[in-house]
Amino acid sequence: MYGGKSDLEVLNSIYTSTYGKTAPDGYLADLLAHGSLESSITTVVNDLLNYNGFDAGTLASQSNYDSQLNTIMYPSYDVAGGAQGVSDVLALYYLVGIDPVSGTVNSLGSQINAGSLTFEQAASKFVNDRPALKSLTNDAFVKLVFTEAYGRAPTSTELNSYTSFLANGGDRGQMLVNVTNDLRGTVGANDQAAQQQFQHDTTPHAPGVIADLASQEQVASIFLAIPERNVDAQGLDDWSSYLNKDGHSLNSLTAKLITSAEFQKKGAALSGNDYIQHVFTAVHGVPATAAQLAQYAKLGSDKSLITTAIINDLRTSTATDAATVTQQHAFEYDIGTSLTYKTAATLSASAAGGNATGTVNTGSSHVLTNAETAVLVNAVLDANAATTVNLKFADHLANLTINGGSATTVNLSDNGVNTGVDVTVNNGNVILNASSGDDDVQVTSAANIAAGTAQFNLGNGNDNLQWAGNATNGVNVVSTNVRANGGNGVDTISANFITKQLTTTSTSGWLGTSYKTTVGTNAGQFSSFEKIDLGGYIGGTGATLNGSGVNVSSGHQFDFGVINGKATTDEIANAGSVTNVSASSTLGTQGFVLSSFADKVHVINVSGGNVAQLEVTGDATANSSIDFTFLKDATNKFNINFDAVSDSDVNAGSISLNSSSSAIFGTALSNVNINSSGTGDFSNVLNLAGSNSQVSNVNISGDHYLDLNIGSGYSSVRNIDASSNTAGVDITSNVAGSGQGIILNFLDLFPFNGITKAIAALFGFKSDDVHITGTAQDDVISAMGNSIVTGGAGADTFKLQSSTVDAGVTIKDFNTHQDTLVDQQSGLALTNNGAINGNNGTQVADYGYSSNDALQSILGGIITGGITSTINFFNAILGIKDQPLSHVGIVGSSAGSYVIVDNNGDGKLDNHDTLAFLQGVSHQDAANMYYNGSITTNGVQSHVTDIAHA
C-alpha cells in the first residue's frame, strides 16, 4: 500500500485518514526528526485517542476516528456480508429459545447472503445439527416454537396444522422459516407485542452501533467482578446485545458466563465464602468483613445471585460514609475506564437535577451514568437551570469550567479522594460545593460579582478563591449576596473580594462642623480563609460624605484593619469620631499570599503573630511591589515563604516593611526570615526595598536557590545568615557597617591583643560590621564596606561593591583554589581556581609577608605616635609605605592576606583604592592568584621579603 513512499508521505497519509484533515505545517516532519516512523504513527494516533480537551476541530476528528474504530470492533452483520442472512439465523435461535452464538450466526448468515444456502436449507441444517431439537416429538417441537415465538401455546388449529405438516414429512427447518415469515408479516392484535419483541431481538444492530450504556456497564461489571479484567470488544457486543433481548437479565447473563472456561479458571470455580470473598474484593477493592461474608452467604449457593447482589448493592448504595462512597466511586471508575469512556465532556444541568446531561460517549443527549461521571477529568458545565448538578462521582476531575447564569448548585467529590479541582467560574450566581481536595477556584470577569448571588463552599483541603476584581475607580464592587466559606484546611481568598467603605456625615453648628465616620466592610461575607492573596489586587477605599461620593487617592491600598478591627481613616480629610468594624476571627489569621503581579499594593494596619508573613506561590515578576505597614509594636519578625510550583524562576518583586515601636518596652521588627522553597527546578528572587531602621537580622533557609537584594534602606541590618539554605544564594547587600572592622578583625587574630586594645583606644577604632553567611553550595555574595563574609562550602563568588581602607570587607573563608573575588569598582576578578591563569590573566604582585614579630614591633611604634590616619596605619602594618603599588597586589601574614587594588594607578594606597582582607588565606596561596578584567594592570610583581619596619 505504501510501497515506494517516503516516511513523511506514509505518515501524512495516516494522519489525514485519522484526523480527516491535513497535518499542521512542519508537525509531521518534526515527529520524524525526533523518532522513527513507527513511534511517529503511535504519537499521531494516541494523541487523538487520548485527547481530552474541547477544541471543536480535534473533537470532530476524534468522533470520526471513534466511529471508524467502532465499525471495526462492532462489525455486526458486516462480518456476514449483510443484514438479511444474520437476521434469518437470529430468528432460528429465537424460535427455539437458544442464545445465539456469534460464530454460527455469522457462518450461516454469510452463506445465506452469498446464496450458497437458502434460508430453508440453513434452517434445516440448524435443526439437524442440534440433537436436542431433533429428539423432540412433533407436538413438543411445535409447542416450543410457539412458546418462544408468541409467548403462548399454539391454538388447537395451529397445533394440528403444524403437527400434521411435520407428520406428513414436512421439515422442521421449513416450519421455522414459515413461523419466521408469519412474524415478519401481519399478525393478529393479540400477537402484535410478540411480533415487536421478535423483530427487536432478531434485527441486528448496524455496524459500529452497540447496546445502550446501561447494558454495557452491566457486562463490564461482571467481567470486573469475576475474571477481574476489562471486557473485550466482542464480548461487550455479544453480551450487551444479549441483555437487550426479552427475558434476559444481569443474573441470567452472570449464570451463563460463570460456566465458561475462563470464568471457571479465574474465580468462578470457588465456592462458599471463598467465592464471596473473591467477588467482593474484586468489586469493592477491599476484602469483605465477617459480617459481610455472612450477609451474602444467606443467598445460598447460587453464584450468579451472589455476584449480582454484590455488584448491585455497591452500585446502588446510598451510604454516605467515606469508605463505602470511595469504593462505589472506584468501581464506577473501573467500569467507565474498561469501556474507554471519554474523560472530557461538555455538560449542562439536568432538568430533574442529579447527574449532568451531555452527549459524551453516545453522540446523543442523555443524563450521564455514574461510570461516565467517575472518569471525568475535564468538564465544561452550562449551569443553565436552578437545580443541582451532581459531580460527586468525579473523584478524578481536575478541571471544571462553569458557564451560564443560573443559580445552579454544583456538588463536587467530597469523599477525600480528589486531590483538588481547578474551577473556572463564569457564572456569578452559581452555588459551588467544592471538593475535599485542594481546589483552585478562579472567578472571571464574566461572573457578575457586583450583582450576583454566588456562594462558594470550598470544604476540606487547602483551597484558593481568586477574583481579579472589577474596580474601575479604585474600588471593587461585591454584591451583598455573594458568600464564601473556605472550610477546613488553610484557605486563601483574593483581597479583591474584601472591601472597605468610609461613610461620613457632617453636622454644622455654632461651634463649627463636626464629623462622624463609620468604617464599613463586607469581610463578614467571607469566613475561614486563613490567608489573603495580594496578587492582582486592584481595590481601594470607597468613601462618601453625606451620601455623596468622595474621591480617595490612596492607590491599591488594602486595610487589614477591616479584619482585625484596627482600620484607620487616613484616606479622608475629616473623619471626626470613628466607629470601627468588629474584628474577624477567621480571616487572614495566617497572613498573606503573593500569587501574581502586585501593582504598588499598600497593606496597612497589619497585625503581628502568624499574620506577619507572606507566602509567595507564583511569579509576581520584578516589577511587582508590595509594602506592609504594621500596627505599632505588632511584631518582632516577618516571614517570607517561597512555596511555588514552577519550572521557571519565581520573582516576588519588591517587598517593603514599615514598622514602629514604643520607646519603652516596645516591640521592634528586628527579624526577617526567608524560606526559599517550592516544587520544581527554579530559583526564587526577592528585593527587600524601602526603608526600615528596625530590621537587624535576615535569616535564609529552604531548599531552593535564592537571589536576594537587600536595599540600602535597611541600614540596621547586621546579620544576614543563609547557612540553613541547602541550595545556594545570590545575596546583594547594599548595607554597609560602620567603624574600622577591617583593622580590628585583623588585629584580634594575633596573640598580642594588649597592644591592639591600646591602639583601638588611641585611634578610637570601633567595629559595627555587617555579618553575611552563605550556604554549603556555590554562592554569590555582594558586600559593602565593613562587612564580614563567610561563604561556606562550595565554589563561591565574593563581590566587593565597596571595600576601602576606611570601610573594608573581610572574607573569613576564602579558598583561592575554588572561590573568586570580584572587585566591582575596578571590574577585576581574582582567583587561583584555574578559570583565570597565565594565559588569560595576570598574577598578582607580591608585596611581602608581615610576620607576627614584625607586626608587634610596628604596632608598638604606632603607639608612640606618628600615625594620623587609617591610610598611614595600613601603610605601616602592611609595609607598603615605601614601595610603589602595582595594579593588584597582596600582603601576607599569619592571620591571612590583604588584597590591594590601586584603582587610580598612582602607585600608593589611598581612599580611591580597594582593600580587602582574606582571613586565613596563606601568603603563598594569595600570591599565586591571577586576575583579569577590562582594566590594564600597572607595575610588576614585587620581590618577596619579610617586612620589618621600625
Question: PLM features: residue spans?
Answer:
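Extracellular glycan-interaction surfaces
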Residues: W239
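Extracellular LysM carbohydrate-binding repeats and other cell-envelope/extracellular binding modules
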Residues: V177, A255
